[in-house]
């Protein structure tokens, strides 16, 4: 019985983020299912949108859903503008951003930062936990690609972390329950 309680507690801590909203129909769908977060991709990608489109979608979005801006090596001013305009609640840095970059960003914004880690080893994840960010996002490493590969990684590499994290990479309706345990 105690083990079931622990599992229930862990699952209740699980939050859902759907990334890559690009069309009004996508916003209608997430409004129906009410994930905790949605991601607007501002980085070069097939799912890329602009700031004005994000603001338009934000107005359509159920107020219970928080928005995440997905950026790769973006100018600090671009991120500051998206935050100031109210387009995004959280900033997801998915590139090669350094500690210094994140420190400078925190001088400009108060929004929480999610730092993506393209997982190669357990040591790398433990080192990333020291970064000046609110959350980590653990994603699959694919050479030359910053994310969105659709492939998973070995979840046994994930150590016990104190910092909350998002799990990405190859998640599907068929495997999501297995991956959040």
Language model region names:
Residues 5-181:
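Conserved N-terminal beta1-alpha1 strand-loop-helix module at the mouth
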């Amino acid at each position: 019985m105690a083990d079931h309680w622990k599992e229930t507690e862990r699952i209740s801590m699980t939050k859902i983020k759907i990334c890559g909203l690009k069309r009004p129909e996508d916003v209608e769908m997430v409004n129906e299912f009410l994930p905790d977060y949605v991601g607007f991709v501002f980085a070069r990608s097939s799912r890329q949108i602009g700031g004005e489109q994000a603001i338009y979608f934000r107005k359509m979005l159920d107020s219970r859903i928080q928005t995440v801006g997905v950026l790769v090596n973006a100018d600090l001013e671009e991120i500051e503008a998206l935050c100031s305009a109210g387009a995004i609640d959280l900033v997801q840095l998915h590139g090669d951003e350094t500690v210094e970059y994140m420190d400078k960003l925190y001088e400009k914004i108060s929004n929480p930062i999610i730092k993506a880690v393209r997982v190669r080893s357990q040591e790398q994840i433990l080192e990333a936990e020291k970064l000046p960010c609110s959350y980590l996002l653990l994603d699959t490493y694919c050479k030359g690609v910053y994310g969105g590969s659709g492939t998973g990684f070995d979840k046994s590499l994930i150590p016990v972390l104190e910092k909350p994290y998002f799990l990405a990479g190859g998640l599907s309706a068929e495997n999501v329950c297995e991956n959040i345990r």
